[in-house]
Structures are given as structure tokens and as C-alpha cells.
């Protein structure tokens, strides 16, 4: 209300379908949960869970980060948007689920929130995708003499920078991937990656 917004806000607990044959399930990368001792880690392994050791700290679970296939509650999200409501959905990337015998079963995984955001923007046929992060502008050639801020680039340029490894696998890369996939689905779209503090300025160009 302080911002003069008087629309109804709805929050949806969101499930996101993932592919059980996604390669990510064979190479888990997402570390999560509390630290465990040797006995607890051994018990987790016996359950079939992956565990990784962090020297000097202990052991933690490590899970897959599969790609989002579709959003289960997308029709509800669309209905609320059509009713002119502000919708909060897909928090944390959504709850990963697998389709099994006409049922949904929870998956031991974490979905990249940026990819889920892109999937939701795609499935709601949004015109723009905005991803907020901690930096005002994305840079290439970080910490080098040729370091450069990116202001406006094409999809082809973004893909080239990704292939050259400018964004790191777990930091800026998922954001660029989400933006590229969103833009490639339909012409006339835009994607913006910036910080919350600079969002208004960025929207004005």
C-alpha cells in the first residue's frame, strides 16, 4: 500500500514436474541441509542419498538440479493473473515432482529458481522476464583488464558468452540460460537482469 498498489496478492504453493531421466539425477550438484557427522552421513548413504564431505566442517546432502518441464499449478496462476491479481509462485524454484502412474511423487532435487522463473514466464506467455540479482550490470572478463559491463546484447551474443564460460556454472549462468530460452520461444520479448535497487532505472532504459 505504501507504493500505491491496491491489487489482491495471492501466493501459490507450486509443484514443478521434472524428467526422471534428466542427466542431473546422475550427477547431483546442489548441496543442502545441515552438516552431519560420519555416522549420520553413513545412514544417509544407506538410504540411497548422495553425501559430500566439506573438509573441516562435516558432511552434507547433495541432490540433483534437474530442468523444469512444466508447472502443475499453471492454470491457477493464469486464472489469478486474468483476475488482475499479483501472483507469487514458484518460490525457490518450486517443489520438484515426478509423474508416476497418474500421480505426482516428490523428487530428491532442487530446481534452479531462475529456470523455473523463465518457465513460468513462458507458460503465462509473458512479454518480459526480469531476474533480480546482487549486481547492477552483468560483466564479462571479470577481474581482468578487459572487464566489460553488458548493457544490451542479442540472444546470439548471450549464447556466445555462455559458451565461452563468462558466467560460471552456478552463478550468473542459470540466469542467462533462463533469459535465452525465454526469448527464443517467441519474438518481441525482452529479458532484464539487474539489481532491485536499479530496477526502475533499468526499466527506463
Features from the language model and the residues they span:
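C-terminal catalytic "cap/lid" subdomain
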Residues: 1-205
